[in-house]
Each structure stands twice: as C-alpha cells, then as structure tokens.
C-alpha cells in the first residue's frame, strides 16, 4: 500500500513538472533577461520559469505553436547587452529594443534568426561592426540601427538584400565607401557618419523615395548615372560633404532644394547658387590662362612647307609646296588675327569698366545722403580712425587699382572673393569695420581676400573659416539681410562694443565686425575642435552625448561652462540660449561659450540696459538648429544665432511666458547639459522631475544612471557623482527659485579634482 502511494505521488509531481516546464523559446528569453543589468521600470518582472511559454510575458507575442514572433521593449530604460542566444529564436520576425541602453557588439550568431523582418535597435550604445552575417537575413524589410556607436565598413551584402526597403543607420561612426546596390530600398539614411570615398554609380533604384548621406566625408563628383533610376519625386540630401564638380543636369537633382547640396564648396550648378565656370565665356583672362598661340597660329604647321595646308576633303596625291599658302599670306593672316583679338579685348574691357563705373557711381550717389564715402576703422581705444589709418583703405571701384596690379590680377582677386563666399561689389560708402581688440593691422580688404572655407550655414547666416595671408585664422559669420538696416547701426555699435569687453577663457572672443551695404560680418576667434554636437563627441542629434570623452574631460567641460556663465552673470549679462551647439572646444578641450550678442543684431529687439553699460541681450523666442543642419560637420567656430521659432529643449519653462531673460534661464540650460554629460544621453523632462528626489542613500542609483563608458573611472567616487547628479537636477528644476546660482554651481564642481577621490566639504544645499 505504501509503495502504491509513493508511486502515485511520484507520478503526480512528474506530471506537474512536465506541465509547467518552460519551452525552448522561453528559456532563450530568460537568458536575455539575465543579460539585462538594470530594469528600473520592472518590465521583466513577469518573466519567470513558472509558465509553459513566454506568450503572456510583457513585450512578447507568439504564434499558435507558442513560438515567439515578436520581442518589443522600446523606451524601457533597460541596460545590458545583446545576447547571442536571441539568434536561437528561429521564428522571431520582429525585434524592437530601441531607445534603451544596450551596449557591446552585435554577436554573429544573433543573425541566425533568419525569419527577422523588422529589426530596430536604434538609440542605444551598441558598438563594433555590423557582422557580414546580416546578409543572411533575406526576409528583412526594415533595419534601424541609428544613434549608436557602430563603426567599420558597411557590409556589401547588406545592399544586396532583395526585400530590404527601409535602412536607417544615421548617427554612427561608419567609415569606408558606400557599397553599390540598394535596388529595392525606399528609405536610406546614412547621415552623420564618417563615410568617405565617392558615390557609387550603381546606387538605388526606382523604389527609392528618400536618400540622405549628409554630414559625411564623401568626395569626388556626383556620378551622372546615380539618378538615372531614381523616381522624379525622390528626396536626395548630399549636404555637408566634400563633393566637387557640376551637379548632373537631371530632373532628379534639379527638383531638390538648394540646401540639400550646401556644405560642399566645390559643387556648382543648379539648384545651388554657385554657377559652374564656363571656359568659353567672354571675359578677360590672365596671361597664364592664355594659350601660347592663338587658334589661328595653332592651326599652322610648325615648319612652313613641311606639311602644307590642304583641303581636308581632297586626296593628297602629289605634295607640292606651291599648292600651300605663301609665307607672306600666312604672316598677314596671323597679324590680322592678333589685331582682331586685341580690338575685341579692348572693347570688352571698355564695356566691363563702364558698367562697373555706373554701378559704383549709383551707389556713391545714394550713400552721400547719409555718410562719407570712406571706410573707417574704429577701435575701443579711439572712437574714430586717424587720417593715416583711413587712407589705408581703398575705394572698391573696378577702374581703381594699385600701379603694379594688372587687370587679370584684379579679376583673379574678384574670383577668389566669390569663391570664398564674400561679395566685394559693395565696399565703398558707409561701410565700417570695427575691431574690438585694437588690431589696427586688420583691413577689410585683407579679410575679404582671405582663403575662406564654409563650416556651416543656417537660414540667417553662413559661417566661414577665414585664413589670412599672415597665417591668422578667424571665424567669420556672414549675416543675411533679415531686415537689417543702416539706421540700426547706431544702436548696434555700442552694443557690440559692450559684448567685446567680455573677455574670459571660457567665452568665444569677439574680435570685431564689418557693417557694409550688402555685407554684415561678425569676426570671432577660431575654435578648432568644434562644438559638443560634433559627431566626434556626440551620439545623436540634438544632444551633447559625449560618449567617447573620458570623465576627466567631461568634468573639465562642465567646470568651464560654469566659469563662463558665472562670469557673464557677474557682468550683469544673460546668455539666454545655452545649448550644446554653443559650447565650443579649444585645443586643450577647454570649453568656450559662444552665441551671445548676435540675437540683438538679427532681431533688432530692445535690449535691457543697466547701469554701467551692461545689457540684456537676448529674446526668449528661439529656433534651435539641429545637429544635422549645423555644427556636425566639424569645427564650428561660432554657433548659429537663433531666429524666431520653436523653443529649444535647453530653454527654461518660464522663458515661454517672459520676454525678459533671467540668469536662471542659463542655470536651467547648464543643468540639462550637465545631466547629458553624466548620463551620455538625452534627458527627458520626466526624468528631470523624478531625479529631483535623489537622496544621500541613492549613491548606487547614481552609478547606474551614469554613462557606462565612465563608470570605471568613477569607482569609489559615488558621493561626488551623486552630488553632480543632484546639482544637475537642481539646476534644471522647473521652479526657478529652487535653482542655484552659477557661482554656487561652480563651487560644487570645484570641490572635486578628477585625479583625486577627496571631496571638500561644501555649505551648498540643493533645492533651496
């Protein structure tokens, strides 16, 4: 009887165990769960071994055979790695782990899931290369690996997948050439990478609707074959590369917006505003460009009589010197041709000069009503230039030149100015060059003739890197008209002089400006390492996200920003538009704050003048240019001024309601940037609100929140890391009164040195 009872109990337990055993797909997902280190939202809490299958788990869907079809956990704040075991889910068709914090490489065996149709791992921290095994996913329809840290070359077999229609790989570090193919792709975004080489001629097909390869290092000409198979309504963005030559005369390219070709100084033709030079156009050329002989002379044999000129349609059967032209006739033809060419040259030169004289005379007549027709040099040390200094500037008439300057040299100089992007047509009259540092050596002609390279552009201005003949380098912003008028110059000049007096190691130095009839230039020191939105430092658009900067450099950047803002506030100024694109990095990665003072010029809004000549200089309405539009292309000497539009995510909430800027606005922007430096990702408003509840006991939580790339450097420094997080959240508090001052914020950061774990005591309290 006892044996029978034991047998019944044994079989009962066996049946229970067999009925509750988790299937193979569930076991694979449990391995995935074990690879997740942080799950702050407890989304994986329902995943356990008690179920027969994972079909009831959060983020999982199955087929009728309890096999996993979908794994979807986007925006879940998960931290971990992608396990190779996911490749064992042989029926998996859709995988979405976007906008999390998964890191590490993509395992090769991960691509054994051959049924995958949708793969989205965007906005993570995945590194390494894309394995060539991705070419085995023949059913793949959509691939989104954007906003990661992937590098290496793009697999050639990726472009050959016959079902792939959507490919998004932007904001990574891919290099090498773009493989040819992509015949069935409809959406292809490879922007903001390090791709070089040339565009392949066999690229895309009739299905293509969107192509973006902007902000790369692609060089060479645009192959004419590249648009043959494109539909006419396709969008093609080739901006900010190193492309050269003419844009193919194809409806595909002619239908594009001109800004889709900007940032390529070597490109010419429609739809850009840079026409291609036509060698046969009637113009006066320099002696170096003139062939050694005229066409008539070039057609004559080198030795008279050795190869006589004959009728090309006749057969030369009996060469006879007497059938050719006599030497006297030949000499007469040559002399006549030379005389004719000389007469034509004189006529063209006369017409050219007359037209230029007429333009200059008209301009001078208009300008005499308001100002003198000399170019004045002003400095802070003297309100007006001496006569000797004024004589150093020449009137820009087409007929006026130095004695040693030839007409061809004049034209070469004009061509250089046009290629540099500067307009030299209006350089007389009420033009004014103002230098704010006493540099009397800088002349407007010297600046306008400098070698210039386009660094970036916005709707209101273009930024150039200007290299003078003596080797000095400046950042020159050419401002658009945007309603700028001469009558505003009287208000602008004292304003820009006040801005020029703000000299600090963590501020971009304003060297001067030029106010002309058709040219408004603002001159800065050139800052070589670009801004925090440079692809070398950032991960994704719109955020600093400096994933590849060590903790020591990040702390240095935070301290420098705090010092610069504290100085501005001490001088009774407000920046009002602080964001990563306005944080520039010098040779030693010392930050320099830019974009203070230009809003006054562009908008003409009333500034709030205080005692001592200081002023409030910004409006609250901002338009934030994206990293793809500007600054991601490399060194950005000065950020773009903002025009009226949408608010920046770095603007304080109260700036929506108030037109008068406050130092608390800058504190808010600093707090958001500090949190991005700490976490290595964009910080949402919800996270800022939740983070304000950090307590002293949350040291381990602060470590988990920190960027994975710097956690090793912060070992044993949890207390200071927690203080940094609390400072960032306090600065970004939605309540202005709870934000510390920049002086207090700087005091917190100065307590810690990156190479030391000693933290000095501080009397600063958060949330006061």
Swiss-Prot record:
Residues 22-328 are extracellular. Residues 301-324, 361-432 are annotated as: Disordered. The modification Phosphothreonine is found at residue 553. It catalyses: L-seryl-[protein] + ATP = O-phospho-L-seryl-[protein] + ADP + H(+); L-threonyl-[protein] + ATP = O-phospho-L-threonyl-[protein] + ADP + H(+). This is Probable LRR receptor-like serine/threonine-protein kinase At4g37250. One of its GO terms (cellular component) is membrane. It comes from Arabidopsis thaliana (Mouse-ear cress). Residues 303-320 have a biased composition (Polar residues). GO terms for molecular function: ATP binding; protein serine kinase activity; protein serine/threonine kinase activity. Glycans are attached at residues 64, 99, 144, 163, 196, 212, 233, 242. Residues 1-21 form the signal peptide. The chain crosses the membrane at residues 329-349. The modification Phosphoserine is found at residues 451, 531, 662. The keyword Phosphoprotein applies. Residues 407-420 have a biased composition (Acidic residues). Pfam families: LRR_1, LRRNT_2, Pkinase. Residues 378-387 have a biased composition (Low complexity). InterPro entries: Kinase-like_dom_sf, Leu-rich_rpt, LRR_dom_sf, LRR_N_plant-typ, PRK1-6/SRF4-like, Prot_kinase_dom. It is a single-pass type I membrane protein. LRR repeats lie at residues 67-90, 91-112, 115-137, 139-162, 163-183, 184-206, 207-229, 232-254. Residues 350-768 are cytoplasmic. It is found in: Membrane. Its EC number is 2.7.11.1.
């Amino acid at each position: 009887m006892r044996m029978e009872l034991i047998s019944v109990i044994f079989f009962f337990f066996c049946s229970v165990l067999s009925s509750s055993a988790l299937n193979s797909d569930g076991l694979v997902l449990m391995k995935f769960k074990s690879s997740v280190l942080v799950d702050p939202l407890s989304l994986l809490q329902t995943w356990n071994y008690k179920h027969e299958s994972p079909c009831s788990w959060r983020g999982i869907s199955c087929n009728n055979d309890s096999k996993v079809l979908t794994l979807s956990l986007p925006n879940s704040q998960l931290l971990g790695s992608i396990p190779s075991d996911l490749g064992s889910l042989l029926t998996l068709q859709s995988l979405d782990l976007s906008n999390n914090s998964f890191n590490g490489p993509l395992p090769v065996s991960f691509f054994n899931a051959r049924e995958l149709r949708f793969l989205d791992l965007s906005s993570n921290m995945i590194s390494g290369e894309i394995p060539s095994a991705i070419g085995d996913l023949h059913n793949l329809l959509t691939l989104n690996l954007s906003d990661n840290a992937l590098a290496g070359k793009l697999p050639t077999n990726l472009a050959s997948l016959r079902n792939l229609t959507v490919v998004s790989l932007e904001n990574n570090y891919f290099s090498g050439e773009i493989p040819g193919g992509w015949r069935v792709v409809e959406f292809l975004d490879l922007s903001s990478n390090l791709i070089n080489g040339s565009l392949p001629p066999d690229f895309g097909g009739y299905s293509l609707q969107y192509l973006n390869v902007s902000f790369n290092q692609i060089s060479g000409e645009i192959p004419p074959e590249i648009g043959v198979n494109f539909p006419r309504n396709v969008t093609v963005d080739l901006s900010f590369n190193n492309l050269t030559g003419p844009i193919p005369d194809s409806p595909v390219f002619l239908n594009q917006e001109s800004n889709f070709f900007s940032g390529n100084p070597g490109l010419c033709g429609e739809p850009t505003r840079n026409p291609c030079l036509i060698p046969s156009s009637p113009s006066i050329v320099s002696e170096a460009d003139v062939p050694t002989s005229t066409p008539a002379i070039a057609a004559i044999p080198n030795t008279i009589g050795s190869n006589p000129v004959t009728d090309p349609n006749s057969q030369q059967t009996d060469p006879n010197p007497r059938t050719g032209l006599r030497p006297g006739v030949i000499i007469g033809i040559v002399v006549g041709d030379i005389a004719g060419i000389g007469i034509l040259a004189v006529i063209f030169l006369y017409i050219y000069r007359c037209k230029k004289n007429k333009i200059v005379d008209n301009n001078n007549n208009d300008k005499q009503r308001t100002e003198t027709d000399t170019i004045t040099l002003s400095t802070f040390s003297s309100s007006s230039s001496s006569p000797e200094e004024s004589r150093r500037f020449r009137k820009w008439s087409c007929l006026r030149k130095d004695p040693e300057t030839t007409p061809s040299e004049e034209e070469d100089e004009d061509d250089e100015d046009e290629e540099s992007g500067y307009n030299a047509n209006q350089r007389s009259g009420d033009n004014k060059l103002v230098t704010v540092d006493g540099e009397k050596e800088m002349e407007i002609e010297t600046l306008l003739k400098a070698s210039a390279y386009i660094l970036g552009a916005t709707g209101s201005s273009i930024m150039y890197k200007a290299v003078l003949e003596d080797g000095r380098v400046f950042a020159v912003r050419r401002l658009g008209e945007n309603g700028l008028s001469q009558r505003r110059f009287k208000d602008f000049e004292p304003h820009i002089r006040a801005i020029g007096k703000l000299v600090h190691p963590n501020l971009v130095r304003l060297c001067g400006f030029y106010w002309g009839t058709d040219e408004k230039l603002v001159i800065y020191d050139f800052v070589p390492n670009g801004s925090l939105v440079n692809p070398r430092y950032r991960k994704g658009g719109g955020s600093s996200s400096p994933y590849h900067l060590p903790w020591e450099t990040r702390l240095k950047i935070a301290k420098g920003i705090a010092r610069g803002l504290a100085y501005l506030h001490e001088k009774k100024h407000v920046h009002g538009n602080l964001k990563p694109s306005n944080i520039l990095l010098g040779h030693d990665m010392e930050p320099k704050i830019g974009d203070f003072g230009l809003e006054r010029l562009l908008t003409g809004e009333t500034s709030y003048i205080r005692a001592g000549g200081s002023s409030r200089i910004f409006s609250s309405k901002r338009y934030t240019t994206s990293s793809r539009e500007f600054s991601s292309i490399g060194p950005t000497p000065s950020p773009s001024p903002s025009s009226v539009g949408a608010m920046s995510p770095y603007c304080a909430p109260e700036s929506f309601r108030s037109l008068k800027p406050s130092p608390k606005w800058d504190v808010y922007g600093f707090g958001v940037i500090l949190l991005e430096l700490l976490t290595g990702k964009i910080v949402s408003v919800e996270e800022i609100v939740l983070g304000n509840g950090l307590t002293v006991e949350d040291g381990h939580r602060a470590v988990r929140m920190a960027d994975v790339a710097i956690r090793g450097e912060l070992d044993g420094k949890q207390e200071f890391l927690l203080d940094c997080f609390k400072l960032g959240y306090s600065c970004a508090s939605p309540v202005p009164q709870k934000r510390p001052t920049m002086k207090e914020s700087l005091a917190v950061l100065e307590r810690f040195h990156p190479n030391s774990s000693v933290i000095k005591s501080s009397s600063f309290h958060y949330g006061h």
